[in-house]
Regions:
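NAD(P)H-binding glycine-rich loop region in Rossmannoid oxidoreductase-like domains
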Residues: 1-38
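SDR active-site strand-loop-helix element
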Residues: 13-17, 51-57, 104-106
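Short-chain dehydrogenase/reductase
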Residues: 29-33, 66-92, 136-140, 168
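Conserved Rossmann-fold NAD(P)-dependent oxidoreductase catalytic core, especially the SDR/UDP-sugar
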Residues: 34-83
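NAD(P)-dependent short-chain dehydrogenase/reductase
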Residues: 82, 94-138
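Alpha-helical substrate-binding/gating segment
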Residues: 121-163
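Mid/C-terminal beta-alpha module of Rossmann-like enzyme folds, strongest
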Residues: 147-196
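C-terminal amphipathic/interface module of NAD(P)-dependent oxidoreductases
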Residues: 169, 185-225
């Protein structure tokens, strides 16, 4: 990382590094914590002006209603979720060492190459005929919007911003819509929602002038690619 930054001498860095190919939460947390520390160390050494970091918006504590940026993270969690929360904390604390920084807490990403795109994990469950989903509330954001928002964030004030569309959705409602899009009729097993599956607001993001291409996942997933 340091040699790349030394060579390119960038003014701004957008940190979107993850390690999710094998759904290994420990590996992804290591990247978020250690990778972010190394990145910020190098950024400060070579006078990078601003860092924009990709975080996630579904690690808030349990509660009623949509979570805001002021909602505490789920520090009382356990297992893989606690590992992921620790990674989010590490990423965001390291990023905030910069004089100028923005953290984007994205909702669940969808689009080509994701779980919800063609041949993705969720897509394949529906096609194969056996679906298991939680009835919790999900806030989505399209991959294209994640890219676009990262550019918009160049002009955001320092801080943390939830980034998701305007239509949080329960798992049961999503499943009914998604199966109709695919014209399939799988066996759908809806699990009870977890208290932390609550979705997120995007008011703070909009107050900075943030705009999405897809204000609802129904537009972004039609058709499913």
């Amino acid at each position: 990382i340091e040699s790349a930054i030394a060579d390119f001498q960038p003014e701004i860095i957008i940190n979107q590094i993850t390690d999710l190919k094998n759904v290994d939460m420990a590996a992804n947390t290591k990247v978020r914590v250690e990778g972010s520390k190394n990145l910020i160390d190098a950024a400060q050494k070579y006078n990078v002006k601003k860092v924009i970091a990709q975080s996630i918006g579904f690690m808030y504590e349990a509660g009623e209603g949509l979570a805001t940026e002021e909602t505490p993270l789920d520090l009382e969690s356990s297992g893989d979720r606690k590992v992921t929360v620790d990674g989010v904390i590490g990423l965001e604390e390291e990023t905030s060492r910069m004089d100028e920084y923005v953290v984007l807490r994205f909702g669940w990403l969808y689009g080509p190459g994701t779980w919800y795109g063609k041949d993705g994990m969720i897509y394949n469950q529906f096609v194969d005929g056996n679906v298991t989903l939680s009835d919790g509330v999900t806030s989505f954001v399209h991959l294209d919007d994640a890219v676009e928002t990262s550019i918009q964030a160049l002009n955001f004030d320092n801080g943390i911003y939830n980034v998701a569309d305007d239509e949080p959705v329960k798992g049961s409602d999503f499943a009914e819509w998604y199966k109709q899009q695919l014209n399939v009729d799988p066996e759908i097993n809806i699990q009870p929602a977890q208290p932390f599956e609550r979705g997120i607001t995007n008011d703070k993001f909009k107050a900075q002038g943030g705009k999405l291409i897809y204000s609802t996942w129904k537009d972004g997933m039609n058709p499913i690619k």
